[in-house]
């Protein structure tokens, strides 16, 4: 951080606004928004960061800021600045091309075309189709059924398409404008999903052709009917109300975000758009930036409704999109948003799985890690993590990676037995003693490397038990996290030292996966244990609430907190009699009355080791 930046940091206001980071050439490399400019901009130059943020900060030599009246103004300004300057570190959509649409032109003799430009020219537009191949497939089918004009300028004689029955040859055609408008309406109905009439017409024509012994023409009609059927199967029915809507869902993990947009037209999912990119700020804020870019830079018609996840600022989206914005609580629309979120998670998991499944990279990472630590190649790595909240239900977990891949059959869970209160060192001592005491007693194969989730204190505890008490010779390393609970540095050696390990390396990525998996496994076990203990104790003694109903409540609401927040009606919906539901509310809310009959549904999407903001 240079002196110029230090001086400017002291002048930052606490107002909302936008900040602009520049490199040594004065080029804008990142634009961001903040509710509090002072806190946000200073955060870049304090503490440690993940790899991608460190890369950004290393290039910043100057910054500017613009104060706005509100957060929404800051959001709109940020989108405009990104659009104008195209900073390399900002969220950018896949390309600057617009999505293709199928268009019926507003001409005396209309044409059916593919276009990426939506204009107010009286034409009928259908789409968007992120997959241009799908748009072309539909157009080819329509060309075979409806003989629209193909030529931009009237030819002097009939064209090739006239001879194959795909053009009316309007220069010699005797049909009036009403005929073509009627045909345009049929296409419109077809693209809106009302294709039964067209199929009936084709079936009638096929029957007439067969009776007239025109078998080739009958076969052509048959093929068209089959093609429409195939197209139907590709367009899944998602909603019964036949509305046009865009459905947004997103998922974040390991500094990456995936946003999926489902295009639902006339109740059918016709296409989806998928984007994966690194994010630098709060995921909710970066998602809003994405939505703004999506509707400003992707030239397509805004639908009747836009569905967004629960945690997103509805008013901010309304400022970006001139449409009805909904955050569905339940039912069909809620399922659509959940489906978009699920697909975003799957896409992001696939991205990381592809990296994990790269055998050469993983094997190379293991070998390089061994060379870096000056130990034999650590084929088997065992890693430990503790979990407790204020000392309650303390647990520990061990995960095992063999050849760089999780060996889940070897995972182990430990309830802490000898420690009272939140003592991480004592818990680590107990678990290490139990695990490797058993390895020694039963002559089990020891690991090639032990990785402890923690710093110098935890690693030294493990060394005392393994080397001094048990007399085992097993290398032990520590993975220390930063204040954001992200893998930060590797500790190893005697005495312990920070290992010079690039955060962009496959070795670091492997260790990060191991640490994340140990944390996920430990916290999952802890939550299960804590939930079981709390759930059983607080719901015991309620007449009419047996084990089966308790299980159903837990399965539906996921946690005791959610049951406590639920209304009586919502509890009844799970199959609990009203009198019992009222008793549950009285037991869980002893200082007040049962919650209102209609309450807002809340869903917690936070999962172990990941940030999943719907």
Curated annotation (Swiss-Prot):
Transmembrane segments: none
Secretion signal span: none
Gene Ontology annotations for the cellular component aspect, listed alphabetically: cytoplasm; excinuclease repair complex
Major location category of this protein: cytoplasm
Residues of the UVR domain: 196-231
Keyword terms, alphabetized: Cytoplasm, DNA damage, DNA excision, DNA repair, Excision nuclease, SOS response
Listed GO biological process terms: nucleotide-excision repair; SOS response
Molecular function GO terms recorded: DNA binding; excinuclease ABC activity
Region: Disordered, residue numbers: 595-614
Family: Belongs to the UvrC family.
HAMAP family: UvrC
Physiological role: The UvrABC repair system catalyzes the recognition and processing of DNA lesions. UvrC both incises the 5' and 3' sides of the lesion. The N-terminal half is responsible for the 3' incision and the C-terminal half is responsible for the 5' incision.
Complex formation: Interacts with UvrB in an incision complex.
Name this polypeptide is given: UvrABC system protein C
Organism expressing this protein natively: Streptococcus pneumoniae (strain 70585)
């Amino acid at each position: 951080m240079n002196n110029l930046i230090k001086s400017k940091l002291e002048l930052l206001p606490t107002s909302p606004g936008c900040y602009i980071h520049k490199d040594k050439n004065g080029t804008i490399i990142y634009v961001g928004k903040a509710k509090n400019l002072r806190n946000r901009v200073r955060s870049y130059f304090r503490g440690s960061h993940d790899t991608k943020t460190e890369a950004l900060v290393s290039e910043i030599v100057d910054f500017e800021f613009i104060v706005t009246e509100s957060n929404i103004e800051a959001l709109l300004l940020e989108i405009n600045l990104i659009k104008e300057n195209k900073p390399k570190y900002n969220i950018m959509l896949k390309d600057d091309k617009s999505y293709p649409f199928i268009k019926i032109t507003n001409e005396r003799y209309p044409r059916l075309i593919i276009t990426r430009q939506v204009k107010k020219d009286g034409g009928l537009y259908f789409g968007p189709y992120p997959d241009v191949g799908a748009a072309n497939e539909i157009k080819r089918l329509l060309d075979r059924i409806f003989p629209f004009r193909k030529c931009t300028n009237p030819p002097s004689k009939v064209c090739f398409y006239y001879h194959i029955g795909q053009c009316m040859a309007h220069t010699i055609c005797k049909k009036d404008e009403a005929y073509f408008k009627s045909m345009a309406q049929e296409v419109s109905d077809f693209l809106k999903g009302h294709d039964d009439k067209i199929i009936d017409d084709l079936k009638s024509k096929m029957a007439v052709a067969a009776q007239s012994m025109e078998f080739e023409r009958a076969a052509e009609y048959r093929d068209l009917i089959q093609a429409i059927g195939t197209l139907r199967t590709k367009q899944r029915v998602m909603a019964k109300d036949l509305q046009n809507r865009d459905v947004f869902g997103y998922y974040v993990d390991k500094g990456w975000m995936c946003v999926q947009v489902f295009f639902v037209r006339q109740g059918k999912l016709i296409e989806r758009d998928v984007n994966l990119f690194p994010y630098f700020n709060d995921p909710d804020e970066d998602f809003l930036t994405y939505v703004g870019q999506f509707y400003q830079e992707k030239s397509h018609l805004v639908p009747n409704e836009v569905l967004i996840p629960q945690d997103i600022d509805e008013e901010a989206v309304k400022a970006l999109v001139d449409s009805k914005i909904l955050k569905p609580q339940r039912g069909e629309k809620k399922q659509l948003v959940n489906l978009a979120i699920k697909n975003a998670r799957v896409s992001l998991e696939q991205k990381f799985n592809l990296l994990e499944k790269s055998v050469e990279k993983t094997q190379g990472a293991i070998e390089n890690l061994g060379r870096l630590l000056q130990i034999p190649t650590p084929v088997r790595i065992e890693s430990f993590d503790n979990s407790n909240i204020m000392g309650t239900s303390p647990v520990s977990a061990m995960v095992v990676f063999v050849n760089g891949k999780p060996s889940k059959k070897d995972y182990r869970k430990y309830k802490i037995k000898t420690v009272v209160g939140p003592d991480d060192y004592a818990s680590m001592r107990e678990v290490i003693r139990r695990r490797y005491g058993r390895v020694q007693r039963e002559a089990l194969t020891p690991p090639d490397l032990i990785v402890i989730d923690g710093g110098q204190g935890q690693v030294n505890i493990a060394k005392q038990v393994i080397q001094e008490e048990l007399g085992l010779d097993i290398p032990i390393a520590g993975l220390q996290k930063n204040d954001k609970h992200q893998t930060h540095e590797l500790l190893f050696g005697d005495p312990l030292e920070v290992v010079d390990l690039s955060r962009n390396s496959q070795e670091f990525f492997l260790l990060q996966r191991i640490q994340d998996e140990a944390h996920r496994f430990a916290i999952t076990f802890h939550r299960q244990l804590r939930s079981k203990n709390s759930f059983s104790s607080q719901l015991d003694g309620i007449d009419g609430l047996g084990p089966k109903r308790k299980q159903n409540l837990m399965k539906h609401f996921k946690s005791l907190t959610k049951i406590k927040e639920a209304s009586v009606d919502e509890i009844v919906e799970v199959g609990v009699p009203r009198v019992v539901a009222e008793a549950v509310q009285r037991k869980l809310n002893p200082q007040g009355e049962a919650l209102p009959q209609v309450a807002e549904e809340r869903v917690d999407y936070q999962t172990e080791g990941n940030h999943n903001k719907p």
